[in-house]
Amino acid sequence: LHTNDAPSTLDRLRLMGLPPFNIASSVILITAQRLARRLCACKVPQEIPKPALLAAGFTEADLDGSWTLFGPNPKGCERCHGSGYKGRVGIYEVMPISDAMRELIMTNANALELERQARREGIRNLRQSGLLKVKQGVTSLAEVLAVTND
């Protein structure tokens, strides 16, 4: 199924005519994924204003100075053929179906309610998972913003 995120998958299954009790009893985990370009080793440190980082989804705690924000090297190198990117990296949202989630499915909860429950359970959405890859220096903020919804 193609959906924008893991919680929307449950809506899609309902729209396909599956009864809520069948969904709740048979689905144990949902994964959503996106591919982002991986920064080449020639990556360069980037300066982005704090308000823009917060607007992208970083928290104040994320901006503690313990990591460096990298972007693609504008000139690139031989390995990346001047693009600043080399290869791809997966960004994932993995949502196990908990008992609380099953109850919401049985009551025909919409994707927004399911999303809220997922956050309460500590499940990272695609954007949050992408921002983690940015903090790790694997991909750029621009790339994560391009392939995820906020």
Regions found by a protein language model. Give the residues of each.
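Short, flexible helix-loop junctions that flank or precede catalytic/ligand sites
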Residues: L1-D150
